[in-house]
UniProtKB/Swiss-Prot annotation:
Keywords: Cytoplasm, Isopeptide bond, Nucleus, Ribonucleoprotein, Ribosomal protein, Ubl conjugation
Family: In the N-terminal section; belongs to the ubiquitin family. In the C-terminal section; belongs to the eukaryotic ribosomal protein eL40 family.
Species name: Saccharomyces cerevisiae (strain ATCC 204508 / S288c)
Domain Ubiquitin-like: from-to ranges: 1-76
Biological processes per GO annotation: cytoplasmic translation; modification-dependent protein catabolic process; protein ubiquitination; ribosomal large subunit assembly; ribosomal large subunit export from nucleus; ribosome biogenesis
Further facts: Ubiquitin is encoded by several different genes. UBI1 and UBI2 genes code for a single copy of ubiquitin fused to the ribosomal proteins eL40A and eL40B, respectively. UBI3 is a polyprotein with one copy of ubiquitin fused to ribosomal protein eS31. UBI4 is a polyprotein containing 5 exact head to tail repeats of ubiquitin. The 60S ribosomal protein L40 is present with 40000 molecules/cell in log phase SD medium.
Coiled-coil segments: none
InterPro entries, alphabetized: Ribosomal_eL40_dom, Ribosomal_eL40_sf, Ubiquitin-like_dom, Ubiquitin-like_domsf, Ubiquitin_CS, Ubiquitin_dom, Ubiquitin_ubiquitin-like
Listed name of the protein: Ubiquitin-ribosomal protein eL40A fusion protein
GO MF terms held by the record: protein tag activity; structural constituent of ribosome; ubiquitin protein ligase binding
Amino acid sequence: MQIFVKTLTGKTITLEVESSDTIDNVKSKIQDKEGIPPDQQRLIFAGKQLEDGRTLSDYNIQKESTLHLVLRLRGGIIEPSLKALASKYNCDKSVCRKCYARLPPRATNCRKRKCGHTNQLRPKKKLK
């Protein structure tokens, strides 16, 4: 039977499959056509993410059904230099004791009118 796979770019891929094919098998066919590794593919049908070990018939996918292909988000760690820069940017601030406005580290008075431009500032607490 024939099914369609629609990518986020709007491109539609046509695949020739059997209802007994597994989702793994379908992902392999997508890799053959598009070059996207199966571990980066997520297939969605009727609002559900399809699990690798299950078959097309498990999800009631019939001829000329359309699956949606979404790529997996890649995570990772932040470089130590970027982490230091981010913590410096976020932590080297002063905070108004009355209105909790974040201010530059060298500020002497609050910039907000609601606390009357008070001079009661404290350093922002450091993240642990």
